[in-house]
């Protein structure tokens, strides 16, 4: 479990300090990961002009991050279980910070793409570890709920501020600043983590080895699937550029299942996880949540710039209501509701409200005013997302022991990330959305995409009856800090 030096010397005050430090580090890591998923999007035209990208290769500035991130998430989660939170956190953050610096100083398309892949690799370690540090520092109950709520809210702010600051930095500074900004954040956090996180001690469950064959197969399978899905915008589903990586990815994942079930002494995803009621159905709901949340940034950015004619900075500002509403709902409303309402009821209600918001967003036209075209839908979308996020994360991680915390977090983040890539690819393929056409034509295409996202949200609501009925967060929570350091 996560431990801070000196935490075992005192009682509740020290435990509170330990958990608070874990929360700060986890939220910072979560913010950086989500921020860099969205920050580069608005800057792509400037990147293309400065480095001379060919139009067809520009997508790899985004895809290289996504491929490395999705492909290595399971590996990153299990790595933390085996080698300890401190060592893996420092390594992942160091890789992320260094490759951000390299990307900001890139002089060619190849160097920028390689740096973005390095960022994705670092993010694949940080993302599951951010959740693991919370679930191993806070016992199930109100305190864990609040910690997960804060982390979810910070991630949502990271996504919204990525769009906002990406536009502002690109318009008033340079596209390079959207990557270089990670450096002055990452370096002090590295020093803080190195100082306060305790090193590993002997684990009560003995020596555990990393399942390298499983890691290779899972990484290859997820990378190939993500690659195939990401190609569907440029190629048909039956073309070799899509079909070959999809087939290869499915074969690799089939081999992964066989290896894990028959040969692995320490599986990358321990089969016992799927005996927990929230893991199977919960991760399917998380897949749909990713398919709903990730595409909204893409299509709403295009809607504001190409339908309403906003500048990059104005489009970034358009996301501020999303962040503000989600913060209020996540930090104030959800913790109170979870003390009185079942988690799956909140998930169903949030999914229905979010679906209504996305349907409203689909009605956007070139003549829409900001109030009815952006702000109104944003309120419903953000309320829905806020109600779904923390209860679903709690459902997926409920009952997971400390030995499997990293694997469970890695699985949850993998399903969410792959759901985002898959949802975006499906919506792009079905709607034929692009950037060429009149504002009215583009509004129609983007509107179809928002209807598709509403369908994903409704599917989450349909799934809620099979999710476990978790106990309400009424008992007073106790922060749980193990003497076993990571």
Curated annotation (Swiss-Prot):
Recorded topology in the membrane: Multi-pass membrane protein
GO biological process: response to antibiotic
InterPro entries: MFS (IPR011701), MFS_dom (IPR020846), MFS_trans_sf (IPR036259)
Disulfide bonding pattern of the chain: none
Taxonomy, superkingdom: Bacteria
Presence of the UniProt keyword Glycosyltransferase in the record: no
Record keywords: Antibiotic resistance, Cell membrane, Membrane, Transmembrane, Transmembrane helix, Transport
Pfam families: MFS_1
Protein source organism: Amycolatopsis lactamdurans
Keyword Phosphoprotein: no
Known function: Involved in cephamycin export.
Membrane-spanning residues: 24-44, 56-76, 88-108, 121-141, 153-173, 178-198, 210-230, 241-261, 284-304, 317-337, 345-365, 369-389, 418-438, 450-470
Origin organism lineage: Bacteria, Bacillati, Actinomycetota, Actinomycetes, Pseudonocardiales
Protein name per Swiss-Prot or TrEMBL: Cephamycin export protein CmcT
One annotated GO molecular function: transmembrane transporter activity
A GO-annotated cellular component: plasma membrane
Subcellular location(s) of the protein: Cell membrane
Name of the coding gene: cmcT
